[in-house]
């Protein structure tokens, strides 16, 4: 949109509101007959030893608790509401001559009433609100999130046979919990303590692709000297956040030193991976010799550390041969991760308790040798286009 009807750069803006349903499996089932799965029965014996009939209110009837195990409960808050997102963006676009366009924009979103799991009976048998029960997990719609980004794109079209695009994004995503029905907060009554970078937060992202049609030559047969095309794709992005010594969970930890002191970030065969953080910089609050707060939550906030970044360069060469008016053959030679860079896993669960990243990103995502960023590989293909 250019309201001035002149050569000023066009401006566009949009917003939108959309629901984000929690899915069909928000509630689990509850068995009214308490039985012990672990007890092995002799032949002919009852497979439900000590089972009692729960005929009353399961919250008050002692028979509903079972005879040997603390009863855990899953519930949904009676005030649960449908989560929703508010999306908004504004873009400015400017032509650079007749062959290039520059676009700069702000893209953002805000999530409200997101689903969050809480243990409303936390603190154990002696301090819990309902001591006859174990965990009382409750699904609530009290979570929030926000995403803010600056996105820039430069597009080049048919400039002396060159077509390409360069794009850079700076972004920051924050929330209290990223996964649907994700991990429990350290303190179910202090959700604000969980506010931090989202599990997928990627602060910097740069991509570029180029496609160049080589000019033909008058020397030699046309089918050999014409129809050549060279392509390249570049992808660079910073790492994603993680919690040290946590897997996908978040234990309370104190940070008592520089987590990167003495760490080279170089692959080390002796430890079977790439040392990323110094384990000596962390300790469990309240443990012997652990400085800092004794609060079980620790002083290390959620997703405060960032894992390895990613870099990948792919190159391909195409040869197009026109056979008939509506039929041509394309011979393709494609090379992936040309510089054979090791791209280690990033994000939640990628860094072990020894501070080492052991998996490559493809192995971590379940596609060893095939995913983006895996070791250098090459394929040759023949394609018929009609």
List each language-model region with its residue ranges.
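Surface-exposed extracellular loop regions of Gram-negative outer-membrane beta-barrel proteins
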Residues: 1-33, 39, 112-120, 231-240
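Core nucleotidyl-transferase/polymerase catalytic module
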Residues: 23-49, 56, 65
């Amino acid at each position: 949109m250019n309201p001035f009807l002149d050569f000023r750069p066009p401006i566009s803006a949009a917003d939108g509101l959309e629901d984000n349903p929690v899915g069909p499996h928000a509630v689990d089932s509850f068995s009214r007959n308490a039985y012990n799965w672990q007890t092995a029965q002799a032949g002919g014996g009852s497979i439900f030893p000590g089972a009692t009939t729960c005929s009353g209110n399961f919250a008050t009837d002692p028979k509903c608790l079972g005879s040997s195990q603390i009863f855990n409960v899953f519930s949904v808050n009676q005030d649960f509401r449908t989560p929703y997102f508010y999306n908004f963006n504004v873009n400015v676009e400017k032509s650079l001559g007749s062959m290039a366009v520059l676009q700069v924009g702000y893209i953002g979103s805000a999530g409200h009433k997101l689903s969050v799991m809480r243990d409303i009976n936390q603190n154990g048998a002696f301090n819990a609100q309902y001591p006859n029960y174990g965990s009382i997990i409750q699904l609530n719609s009290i979570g929030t999130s926000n995403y803010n980004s600056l996105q820039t794109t430069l597009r080049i079209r048919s400039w002396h046979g060159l077509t390409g695009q360069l794009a850079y994004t700076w972004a920051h995503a924050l929330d209290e919990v990223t996964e649907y029905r994700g991990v429990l907060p350290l303190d179910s009554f202090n959700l604000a303590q969980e506010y931090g970078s989202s599990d997928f937060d990627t602060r910097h992202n740069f991509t570029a692709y180029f496609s160049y049609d080589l000019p033909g030559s008058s020397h030699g047969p046309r089918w050999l000297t014409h129809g050549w095309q060279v392509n390249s794709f570049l992808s660079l992005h910073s790492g994603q956040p993680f919690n040290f010594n946590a897997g996908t969970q978040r234990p309370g930890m104190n940070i008592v030193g520089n987590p990167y002191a003495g760490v080279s970030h170089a692959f080390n065969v002796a430890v079977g991976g790439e040392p990323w953080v110094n384990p000596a910089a962390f300790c469990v609050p309240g443990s012997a010799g652990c400085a800092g707060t004794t609060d079980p939550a620790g002083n290390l906030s959620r997703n405060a550390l960032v894992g390895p970044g990613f870099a990948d360069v792919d190159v391909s060469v195409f040869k197009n041969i026109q056979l008939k008016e509506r039929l041509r053959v394309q011979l393709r030679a494609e090379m992936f991760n040309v510089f054979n860079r090791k791209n280690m896993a990033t994000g939640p669960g990628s860094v072990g308790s020894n501070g080492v990243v052991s998996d490559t990103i493809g192995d971590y995502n379940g596609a060893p040798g095939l995913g983006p960023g895996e070791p250098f590989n090459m394929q040759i293909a023949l394609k018929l286009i009609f």
